[in-house]
């Protein structure tokens, strides 16, 4: 599903609930297995912008794993940059936003993340080895289409623009 930050997004055939999610991406730089939160920073190469697109019907209404709604072709734009960890003073205090067709849909901050970067790396490393190049998408702020009343979803031809402070824009 991973594509470049400016590649076209293709809404899947039979999709009616394709949704957007601006997220902080954490790029692993050193193998991590069973590490503590205090050790997590040693395993980070850097950070990037991720649009963790989701097809909500595939994800939630067709039973089973969420992977069906998260792994559609072109659903993982990443970048435009890998910003090394030494260039990010506090990954838990970055503004983030996403516009659809010029309208601001998400306007948040990494400081409102349910789980911090160090916790996520430590937690995941207890269940799987994290390898250099792995990217962890850390969650999205309010403003996804599924959460609106009435719900709003992407249509072919819609344009998204998103960014995270200091990490660039897509």
Where are these regions (language model features)?
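General beta-strand structural signal in soluble alpha/beta enzymes
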Residues: 3-4, 49, 138, 162
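N-terminal accessory regions of nucleic-acid-interacting proteins
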Residues: 33-47
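Extended, compositionally biased flexible segments
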Residues: 1-12
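Short helix/loop capping segments that flank catalytic or ligand/cofactor-binding pockets
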Residues: 5, 35-37, 57-59
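Residue-level recognition of short, solvent-exposed, well-ordered loop/turn junctions
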Residues: 4, 19-21, 131, 155-156
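Catalytic-pocket segment enriched in acidic/His residues
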Residues: 56-170
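Short helix-loop capping/hinge motifs at secondary-structure junctions, enriched
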Residues: 32-35, 87-89
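Short, structured patches in soluble enzyme cores that scaffold and shape functional sites
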Residues: 13, 22-30, 48-53, 82, ...
